[in-house]
Amino acid sequence: FNALTGANQYVGNWPGVTVEKKEGKIKSVAGTDGETLCTHGHEMTLVDLPGIYSLSPYSMEEVVARDYIINERPDAIINIVDGTNLERNLYLTVQLLELERPMIIALNMMDEVAKNGDTIDCKRLALELGIPVVPISARTGQGIDELIKSAQKLIYAAHTQLHEGFHIEPDDVYDDYT
């Protein structure tokens, strides 16, 4: 959250640190053409939800996170996944995928993964899950700009796609001048 917004909130990589949602404006990153990708002058608001391992409403953190995701229907979800404990975190990822919201995985702690001599095939993980996966380290800032660009592209794509079943007849868009 802090790396993405420039804020200085107390955050951690375990459930219970954040018990309520926090909001911040996401910093903007210029694209290769020098223009800010897809924000078109609009700020993006990032909502930090409590760290959870599932959407089951058994704890206050889970209730807050679940209610926000289901009721507020955010434009997109950035799912922060601990790369040092992938299996435990993918349970929540699968639940979030079932909600059919645009989502990107920020595979965090990749500096620790490398330090431990491990590797994660992010391209294969993205292919298997069907969503973008961006390796990051919130501690070092590695991958944060790429994450922001990927999130901007995801939101832009979600807003520009025609809804399923939406149909325009060419005759409907022309004024009748006869």
Language model features with spans:
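Conserved G1/Walker A P-loop phosphate-binding module
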Residues: 1-54, 71-72
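Preference for short coil/turn "hinge" residues that link or interrupt alpha-helices
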Residues: 4-7, 12, 62, 79, ...
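Hydrophobic aliphatic residues
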Residues: 4-5, 69, 81, 151
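Conserved nucleotide-binding/hydrolysis micro-motifs of P-loop NTPases
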Residues: 7, 16, 51-53, 83-87, ...
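Helical mechanochemical/support elements of P-loop NTPase systems and associated helical scaffolds
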Residues: 15-22, 45, 57, 61-64, ...
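Conserved C-terminal guanine-recognition region of P-loop GTPase G domains, centered on the G4
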Residues: 27, 36-40, 64-134
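Canonical P-loop GTPase G-domain recognition
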Residues: 111-165
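Long, well-ordered amphipathic alpha-helical subdomains in the mid-to-C-terminal portions
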Residues: 162-178
